[in-house]
Amino acid sequence: GFEIERLERIVTSLAKAAQEAGVRISAGDTKVLRRGEGGGVYLATTGVGVRLPGVRPAMGRIADGDILIVSGPVGDHGTAVMLAREEFGLRGDLVSDAGPVMKLTEPLLALEGLRFMRDPTRGGIASIGHEILKATGLGVRFEATVPVREPVQSVCDMLGYDPYYLACEGRVVAILAPDHVDAALDLWHGLPEGRDAVRIGRISAAE
């Protein structure tokens, strides 16, 4: 069976994360597998929320010349998961960036020049570029300023991965009109979660 101590640690972590995010865990279900059908704990969640009145950001508002910013270094989570699983014989102490993003997103809603924002989870920041191209016909030019921690880059260099495609679970990518970028970065730099925020690219007509 599964150790009670480990289960208690998981539940405590869940409670802490819910408190930090300002959400309630309203329901739950458990299932016990027969021996040999699986090991450990599998967690799946469904979030239910309410769209705030007047919230305008949408991919359709993105325009040529808009600027992309990110709240912090990319690829931490994807790399941390690989190291935790000890895949490819690699080990390390890199910590996942997993965390609530509401403190990052809410302040930007007051900016008229906010076009769109999203967390770069599955597929990383590169997937956001692909989605923008598919939805709007506009491309993304990423700049050399994209922040990647040295341990993340080292793992990617060894394994042939691109950090732009690695998942981030506590970051936000925001797209803004050029004259609102400085205001957005100032807001993020005033938060612990956004102190490493930087500009990372520009929207341009697809070539």
Q: How should each PLM-predicted stretch be described?
A:
Residues G1-E207:
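Helix-biased detector of long, well-ordered alpha-helical tracts
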